């Protein structure tokens, strides 16, 4: 039971960080140009109206793919491809 609670909290924190990045970019706040060391992938979130790109860890990519809404397309690229 403890492991389930810890896993849930880790997922919530990870998803919260990813959503924070999306919200920052959606609100027009300039994000850093370079990814952090742990962010080895570029996550692209495509919805009906917007396409958002940000750096993410492998775990964040997996979580976002699982938690995506219908109509959203999420892809993850290797390396720092967000600025391309």
From Swiss-Prot:
Q: Which residues form the signal peptide?
A: 1-18
Tell me which stretches of the chain form a coiled coil.
Answer: none
Disulfide cysteine pairs (residue numbers):
21-42, 35-55, 61-76, 77-82
**Membrane: is it a keyword of this entry?**
no
Keyword field: Amphibian defense peptide, Disulfide bond, Secreted, Signal
Report the locations given in the UniProt record.
Secreted
Q: Give the main localization category.
A: secreted
Per the record, the GO terms for biological process are: defense response
Q: In which tissues is it expressed?
A: Expressed by the skin dorsal glands.
Task: Please give the GO cellular component terms listed in this UniProt entry.
Answer: extracellular region
Please verify whether the record's keywords include Transit peptide: no
What does the function comment of this entry state?
Lacks alpha-neurotoxic activity, has apparently no antibacterial activity, nor anti-coagulant potency.
Report the protein name in the record: Xenoxin-1
Source species: Xenopus laevis (African clawed frog)
């Amino acid at each position: 039971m403890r492991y389930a609670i810890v896993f849930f909290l880790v997922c919530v924190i990870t998803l919260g960080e990813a959503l924070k990045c999306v919200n920052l970019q959606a609100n027009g706040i300039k994000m850093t140009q370079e990814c952090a060391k742990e962010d080895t992938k570029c996550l692209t979130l495509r919805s009906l109206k917007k396409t958002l790109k940000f750096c993410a860890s492998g775990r964040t990519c997996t979580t976002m793919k699982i938690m995506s809404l219908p109509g959203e397309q999420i892809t993850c690229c290797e390396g720092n491809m967000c600025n391309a």
